[in-house]
């Protein structure tokens, strides 16, 4: 079990330089999994300006975006506003992304049900630098000056081809569009656990993903039993402790599969929790 305090971390370099955006795009790397695993994941905080552009595209993995501030464009006239959460399923098209407001976003990327995993930021940067010797990245597209063969390709697809030696395989999409959720529209429901209330925001069983908000009353405790799932917590209000670690606004917690932990608050605490089960063996 680990804790990081995103609000206190400095902004790092852009992890999506292949999409452009310059130095105005920045990221904070919170937690990540194991490269080449079908369960590989990356949790980051992202800062994007309203000038950021990404063409219509899709991924062979899954993504969740929690808009903390501003507004995220995900298609023409479609936005994820502050406090809203969007799920981008594997193989589902979205975009173009342009306009909206400057925003700060909590972003989780993780291997989809197809078991292909995803390429982590370090390997992606290495590939991008290697590919820059033979072409250029512009507006989310990799362009090559070649006599024969395909000249232009989606930036991420081009990197995937460079790293893995083949283009990504897209499973039949389970959803036509990304799913945008409005947590504030849901009532808090009293849990069977004393002093705990929840909002069950979204459950996506084909990938074992659940998105839930928790509210812990002053003086309350919450136990995370040992489980096969990965649990990622993001504190949205209040203060508390998980084991010996202090929690505050924008603290993030990783409870790994098999770990048990207890969270306690004296003054009250709210957090958003992403729970992800391992990719099923028959899928991987």
Predicted segments with their positions:
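Jelly-roll (double-stranded beta-helix
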Residues: 1-284
